[in-house]
Design a protein with these regions (language model features):
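Predominantly the structural core of cysteine protease catalytic domains
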Residues: 7-154, 158, 162-238, 242-249
Length: 251
């Protein structure tokens, strides 16, 4: 599937009634934006579908009718090992991650990126990791103050900037990059399961934006939540429930 990054960007803007993500199309994004977009079945929209609708689309317009599959299971990958992340890519395809981006750390043709340990933080940037190469030469990276990665190996990344380099918008990101998979730019995640959206399937939800903020329960061992829905529209069989938590070993 080739989902439209432009649609997610426009969807994740403040609506005319003031609701939604508090940002405009040129603002930075948030780590939870893509999670909300996918888990609320507002996306993704196939690029080919969006291309035919783009001229008439506004952030207030609902295009969820063009979403064919809805995410039903998403796994956080923070604190995962390199081998576990590789397995996630093998099992479920690309994963969402973020790193600290500055043009200073790119090589000359913008196909390789390495930010050494101890480097100052720059702007966070979200990417899709689609593969890896354990033998990708460390010599391909730009030496920062004479420093290269200690070892070969890099993740293959699909960026969202179009065909801006000789790899058609892909680039290699060193395994040893300082901020990739760090707590600075969490969360990283993979979509582990989806369901086909048909006329017989409906997602009942109180809002469509996902987790627009987070909070902790420090002293409680259990938490109870209540959502109230109206099932009078003919959708009267509840076969699953989704909720979000960052607790380890949760399913």
């Amino acid at each position: 599937n080739n989902f439209s990054a432009e649609h997610m960007n426009l969807w994740a803007t403040t609506k005319s009634n003031g609701k939604g993500w508090q940002r405009n199309v040129t603002s930075d994004g948030y780590a939870f934006t893509a999670l909300g977009y996918l888990s609320s079945w507002q996306g993704g929209i196939e690029q080919s579908d969006y291309d035919t609708l783009a001229e008439k689309y506004t952030p207030d317009k609902d295009l969820s009718a063009f979403v064919n599959y809805g995410a039903t299971a998403i796994k956080y990958l923070d604190d995962c090992t390199q081998e576990e992340i590789k397995q996630e890519i093998m099992d479920n395809g690309s994963i969402y991650a973020a790193y600290s981006h500055s043009p200073y750390y790119e090589n000359n043709d913008r196909t390789a990126y390495f930010c050494p340990q101890g480097s100052p933080k720059s702007t966070g940037h979200a990417i899709a990791i689609v593969g890896w190469d354990d033998n990708y030469s460390k010599e391909n990276f730009k030496a920062i103050n004479g420093v290269l990665p200690e070892n070969d190996g890099a993740w293959l990344v699909k960026n969202s900037w179009g065909d801006y380099n000789t790899l058609n918008g892909y680039f290699w990101l060193s395994y040893e990059d300082s901020y990739l998979f760090s707590s600075t730019f969490k969360y990283n995640f993979a979509v582990e399961d989806v369901t086909e959206i048909t006329d017989d399937v409906k997602l009942m939800q109180n809002e469509i934006y996902g987790a627009t903020y987070e909070f902790n329960y420090i002293n409680d061992d259990s938490v109870t939540y209540l959502n109230l829905f109206n099932f009078s529209e003919g959708y009267n069989k509840l076969d699953s429930v989704m909720f979000e938590t960052t607790a380890k070993n949760s399913d």
